[in-house]
Amino acid sequence: MEAKGKVVGVIGNLVTIEMVGTVSMNEIVFIKTGGQSLKAEIIRIRDGEVDAQVFEMTRGIAVGDDVEFTDKLLTVELGPGLLSQVYDGLQNPLPELATKCGFFLERGLYLSALDRNKKWSFNATAKVGDFVVAGDFLGFVIEGTINHQIMVPFDRRDSYRIIEIVGDGDYTVDDKIAVIEDDAGGKHIITMSFHWPVKVPVTSYKKRLIPNETMVTQTRIIDTFFPVAKGGTFCIPGPFGAGKTVLQQVTSRNADVDIVIIAACGERAGEVVETLKEFPELTDPRTGKSLMERTCIICNTSSMPVAAREASVYTAITIGEYYRQMGLDILLLADSTSRWAQAMREMSGRLEEIPGDEAFPAYLESVIASFYERAGVVVLNNGSVGSVTVGGSVSPAGGNFEEPVTQATLKVVGAFHGLTRERSDARKFPAINPLDSWSKYRGVVEYEATEYARAFLVKGNEVNQMMRVVGEDGVSIDDFVVYLKSELLDSCYLQQNSFDSVDAAVSFERQNYMFNILYKILQSDFKFENKLEARSFINDLRQNILDMNLAPFKQEKFNKLEINLKNLLRSKKLDF
């Protein structure tokens, strides 16, 4: 029976609807008010009533307004044309909305996610008579720098036989590409695009693998000490202004992935505008073209409705899973998951649910876990491998890592890059605290060597704390040298200058080379007459290595500086 309903209550963006008929959880409904249709999602079903969260401002909605039930879940449209786009959480293209509305967006306006008129050059790879299942390739089109595979829609559950497929040529996303037939003789038309519900993980693959290949971000402290694997998960918690967004932008520019998806869910509008302005101007180091050609941005700022903020996270991960099905490596950056959790807290409060810690819903951990678990490495039906790596920034109030969102995130991620106010105030970029952070993945340098270096950082920090109490004269010269060595490692390796063309992105080979130099220095047993001599010598080493960091790898300037470094060390009778 077709459902019918009327509004009986409104609290903020939560609308209670009295209905007759059959409805399903997470079904999309449209509330008719003032000549507009406002999209909403059912989030609770009770006897004769449903509660729906509205994706727009609810001003003007009145008791008695009609409600139209669609019998569909919240979906995204998947097909060629997603890359280089900027969408809101409901996959409305923002540049087109701006053209249509100007500076202030109208309520109830929903546009097509893909360009219906653009023609794509289709190249068929399947042929009539082939048997296919969900996720199998029928052909491809060129989208930017990638081969965008046209696939059998993921909602097809059986095996099908291709009975018709078009020849190579130019087609729109709505044109018929193929016709497939099921076992019962039913025929199904395939176009270049299809819809998929955002809260349902894509499972059209053979099997999942354990992530073990390092995703090189070209940021030394991450790749060497706290690495991230392709298909893995990581989080970047830190106080406001510690550099979370900048670190994510640097990672998206330099990471060893095919496609970057940025979900700006609940960030300040100024930061989102900065991202939208910068990305088209950034040059992709891999292709020499604009970085936007392999980027998709989903943005819902903190000033947009709460429900759409939550939807943007799911929209982004679904688009990521779609491109993973093509055998590509995807990096999804969610900034910030704290705002998403706050949106859940707001809705939970309006639903009058029993609150958990700090009034967050009791199911916060399971929702966060279900999001991060959609990352992973998968083997596709044709044997190729694709991955989605998920990185979420967390903005705990006052930088308190004990709050519920950070703790729930730490339980499910494979790497933790904790930013601290102390390091960001000291102008250390990235402001990742090497003493608190950790990773379960394999990095570009041997684990034993990095643990040896980390032990130096821990010991150096202990000596530093001691010197703050008793002064420099209160520690032995051996302890003082340990402190100087830890500071050398920190300034020359853990910190990076993202404004310098050379130091901003450090290759896998260069990281190994420079770490080995510093590793040998840490192992060396220096003999000094006094602390003044020790400080002077280590400072000379530091300046030399910092200059090497800014010189192109293994070119004339770099080689000269390396000879200077060896001469410095030989002056202490060390064979280097």
From Swiss-Prot:
This protein's record includes keyword Ion transport = yes
User: From which domain of life does this come?
Assistant: Bacteria
Q: Which UniProt keywords apply?
A: ATP synthesis, ATP-binding, Hydrogen ion transport, Ion transport, Nucleotide-binding, Translocase, Transport
* GO terms assigned for molecular function: ATP binding; proton-transporting ATP synthase activity, rotational mechanism; proton-transporting ATPase activity, rotational mechanism
The reaction(s) catalysed by this protein are: ATP + H2O + 4 H(+)(in) = ADP + phosphate + 5 H(+)(out)
Matching Gene3D superfamilies: 2.40.30.20, 2.40.50.100, Bovine Mitochondrial F1-atpase, Atp Synthase Beta Chain, Chain D, domain 3, P-loop containing nucleotide triphosphate hydrolases
Q: What is its EC number?
A: 7.1.2.2
Q: Name one GO biological process term.
A: proton motive force-driven plasma membrane ATP synthesis
Q: Which SUPFAM superfamilies match?
A: C-terminal domain of alpha and beta subunits of F1 ATP synthase, N-terminal domain of alpha and beta subunits of F1 ATP synthase, P-loop containing nucleoside triphosphate hydrolases
Any one cellular component term from GO for this entry? Answer: proton-transporting ATP synthase complex
Binding site residues for ATP: 238-245
Q: Cross-referenced InterPro entries, in alphabetical order?
A: ATP-synt_VA_C (IPR055190), ATP-synth_a_Xtn (IPR031686), ATP_synth_asu-like_sf (IPR023366), ATPase_a/bsu_AS (IPR020003), ATPase_F1/V1/A1_a/bsu_N (IPR004100), ATPase_F1/V1/A1_a/bsu_N_sf (IPR036121), ATPase_F1/V1/A1_a/bsu_nucl-bd (IPR000194), ATPase_F1/V1_b/a_C (IPR024034)
Described purpose of this protein according to its UniProt entry: Produces ATP from ADP in the presence of a proton gradient across the membrane. The V-type alpha chain is a catalytic subunit.
Per its UniProt record, what NCBIfam families does this chain match? PRK04192.1
Please give the family membership noted in the entry: Belongs to the ATPase alpha/beta chains family.
Tell me what this protein is called: V-type ATP synthase alpha chain
Q: Which organism is it from?
A: Borrelia duttonii (strain Ly)
Q: Which gene codes for it?
A: atpA
